[in-house]
Amino acid sequence: MKIAIGCDHGGFPAKAAVIEVLRRHGAEVEDLGCHDTNSVDYPDYARAVCERIVEGRADRGVLICTTGTGMAIAANRFSGIRAAVCDTPERARRGRSHNDVNVLVLAGACHPAGELAAITTAWLEGGFEGAEPGKERHARRIEQIERAGRRSEFALLGRTDPEIHAAIAAHIAQEDATINLIASENYVS
């Protein structure tokens, strides 16, 4: 499994310990920075990690900042990213099993290295239950979240290009209201 990791200056002191846990579990780790405690903008590192996942160059990601909040907000702006701040091993385990969390967000300043290791281990070892019989509700809920994200992106188009938005909305309404039959002829010689 390939995991991209990123942090800001507040998460930098915790990053080495988290990387060690990831590697101990057999993960190939790509460290996207930052590389010291000089002040940086956390959205840059959230973007770098999330782009790797969205583009298929990483399977999952880890983000670390002081509280985790800013990184989680930035990460969840990306379609297909399910980032969660996990502050206990149980929340990390449930985040994976119920929500298929693909980006673990850690509050580097709020936990000692041992706790961060336990949280990371629980997230790594957890699996998504959505395909298991009787637990399909988890996959259904993720699809609902993805649909809401697509609607949100479509709404944004309404503000940025109302003419295109109106044309697409009219087409969707027409498709919903009618059955379109496509005729084709096949000839056999």
Residue spans for each PLM region:
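Glycine-rich phosphate/diphosphate-binding loop of Rossmann-like nucleotide-binding domains
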Residues: 1-24, 29
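Structural motif
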Residues: 2-3, 59-63, 82-84, 101-105, ...
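Short, structured coil segments at secondary-structure junctions
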Residues: 25, 78-79, 99
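Solvent-exposed alpha-helices and their adjacent loops that cap or buttress functional pockets
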Residues: 53-57, 96-98, 172-174
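N-terminal glycine-rich, Lys/His-bearing helix-loop that initiates the first secondary-structure elements
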Residues: 152-189
